[in-house]
Design a protein with these regions (language model features):
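P-loop NTPase switch/coupling surface
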Residues: 1-173, 192-210
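Low-complexity, highly charged intrinsically disordered N-terminal segments
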Residues: 178-194
Length: 210
């Protein structure tokens, strides 16, 4: 989606910093605007997108605690089971950690163009569960206001001939299973209900004359 209208209505990411996540020990991506990630295989394009999706999932799950105060200098931890971790398909949580060193925490920090910066911790527990919470550097008001809606759609292997209407939890589950072709129509319906849909149509018309 491009254009100033889309930027006014949505949270735009300005910078992503990843620590101990999959192939990266520490790396920062500066995102100056609407971008396309391009490059050879195994250079981290998908990893960066998965990190953003993991940040969104972690913050959303943590906010369900409805506890925005620090306790002893840190925020409370919220558990996430492997089966509920829809951001990245996993057979065990140690696959998220750099070189599979499953200890300590992963940190994913997002800085938005709206001025807030929030780093989320993913804390090792077992192969079937992690804990998540914001880093304490972000004050409670910032954490409360921070919001980023993401959908990471992996490469498709084919479209289903029939597709029922799914609840959002089922959509997330099928994405986690690597089956975006089973829910692409649901994703389009969801996108159609937002103000950005007309901007997307205009962009497709301008770029592809379709």
């Amino acid at each position: 989606i491009g254009g100033d209208e889309a930027e006014r209505g949505r949270t735009m990411i300005e910078r992503v910093t990843i620590r101990r996540f999959k192939r990266f020990n520490e790396v920062t991506f500066d995102l100056p605007g609407h971008i396309v990630l391009a490059g050879p295989n195994n250079t981290g394009k998908t990893t960066m997108l998965q990190a953003v999706a993991a940040w969104d999932l972690s913050l959303t799950r943590w906010k369900q605690l409805n506890d925005y105060q620090r306790h002893g200098g840190s925020y409370a931890k919220a558990p996430i089971a492997r089966q509920a971790f829809s951001a990245v398909p996993l057979r065990a949580f140690d696959l998220l950690w750099n070189e599979r060193r499953y200890s300590g925490s992963i940190e994913i920090e997002i800085q938005s163009k709206k001025g807030w910066t929030v780093a989320m911790e993913l804390i090792a527990d077992s192969t079937e569960q992690v804990y998540v919470r914001p880093k304490p550097q972000a004050d409670p008001q910032t954490v409360r206001q921070a919001q980023l809606s993401t959908v990471f759609v992996p490469p498709m292997t084919g479209l289903s001939t029939a597709e029922p209407v799914y609840q959002r939890s089922k959509v997330d589950q099928l994405l986690w299973q690597g089956k975006p072709g089973d829910i692409i129509r649901n994703l389009l319906v969801e996108a159609h209900q937002t103000a950005a849909w007309n901007v997307l149509k205009d962009s497709i018309q301008r770029l592809f004359h379709y």
